[in-house]
């Protein structure tokens, strides 16, 4: 098991190094002309979502870090329509009215493999739980390399690991289906009792945790601390996975939802957890006369 550096809940790196880490991650995703959204769900006591659009990695990182340690910060993995910059030009609005939809994405640049440790919902991972996710990541990346896949960008997400393989796909229903089938095949092959691959992240407008910022689930405790996400490996070149390799892995497997929406006990995770993880803003209403809670 590799040692995983984590911060005490009360500390954080010096701001210059922190800014450099976030900028390095964003810069690894960026191409000239890109625009991306920063989104911060439920950042205040009223449950508002903050959002802003940026055409510069440096400006994005500086603005996003104002929320670091206050709420979980996310970024659209794929570039958005540049016209969306006019919603909030290189700044974050604390009460966003609109966020990015699948139709707003120009192209699919990355296959997002989100590896999470199996644990109860709403809490951070222990070192042992995190190690299970690391083992899955290492097995997956080594075996895909043996099959001719290029080197991915890898990150500690806080409670698991991100693996990002460059791809070059149009934003079409066919591409969404292919990505969904690839994730389903990977989950079928690599999921364990201690860690799973999230198969629900195939949509084009998927948001990803902003690497370099704190990831907070529940309260920080000695055995379940809040950890700062960080880059692990950035390849020297971003060679896209060919569509042929994607199809070979996907085979005829249909896209499917895996039990990542369930807790360790097998119970279905609360809808509020799923909405928050997806970065969807919501308001919970009191149960009506039939006992139904509306969102």
Residue spans for each PLM region:
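Signature for HUH/AEP ssDNA processing cores
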Residues: 2-159, 166-185, 267, 271, ...
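Short acidic (Asp/Glu) and glycine-rich catalytic loops that position anionic groups and cofactors
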Residues: 39-46, 161, 223-227, 251-257, ...
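Short Gly/Ser/Thr- and Asp/Glu-enriched loop/turn motifs at secondary-structure junctions
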Residues: 108, 156-161, 202-207, 290
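N-terminal structured subdomain of primase-like DNA metabolism proteins
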Residues: 255-295
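Long, charge-rich alpha-helical interaction segments
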Residues: 222-268
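Flexible helix-coil linker/hinge segments at domain or subdomain boundaries
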Residues: 184-221, 241
């Amino acid at each position: 098991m590799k040692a995983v550096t984590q911060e005490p809940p009360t500390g954080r790196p010096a701001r210059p190094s922190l800014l450099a880490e976030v900028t390095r991650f964003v810069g690894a995703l960026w191409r000239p002309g890109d625009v991306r959204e920063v989104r911060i769900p439920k950042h205040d006591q009223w449950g508002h979502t903050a959002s802003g659009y940026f055409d510069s990695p440096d400006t994005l990182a500086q603005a996003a870090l104002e929320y670091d340690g206050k709420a979980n910060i996310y970024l659209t993995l794929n570039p958005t329509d540049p016209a969306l910059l006019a919603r909030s030009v290189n700044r974050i609005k604390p009460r966003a009215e609109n966020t990015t939809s699948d139709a707003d994405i120009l192209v699919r640049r990355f296959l997002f493999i989100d590896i999470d440790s199996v644990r109860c919902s709403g809490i951070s991972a222990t070192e042992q739980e995190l190690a299970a996710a690391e083992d899955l990541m290492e097995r997956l990346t080594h075996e895909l390399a043996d099959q001719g896949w290029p080197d991915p960008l890898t990150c500690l997400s806080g409670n698991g690991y991100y693996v990002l393989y460059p791809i070059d796909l149009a934003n079409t229903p066919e591409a969404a289906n292919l990505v969904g089938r690839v994730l389903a095949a990977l989950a079928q092959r690599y999921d364990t009792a201690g860690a799973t691959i999230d198969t629900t992240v195939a949509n084009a407008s998927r948001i990803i945790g902003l690497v370099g910022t704190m990831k907070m689930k529940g309260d920080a405790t000695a055995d379940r601390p809040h950890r700062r996400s960080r880059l692990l490996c950035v390849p020297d070149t971003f060679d896209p996975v060919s569509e042929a390799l994607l199809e070979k892995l996907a085979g005829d497997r249909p896209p499917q939802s895996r039990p990542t929406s369930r807790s360790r006990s097998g119970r279905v995770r609360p809808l509020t957890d799923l909405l928050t993880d997806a970065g969807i803003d919501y308001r919970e209403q009191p149960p009506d006369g039939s006992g139904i809670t509306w969102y």
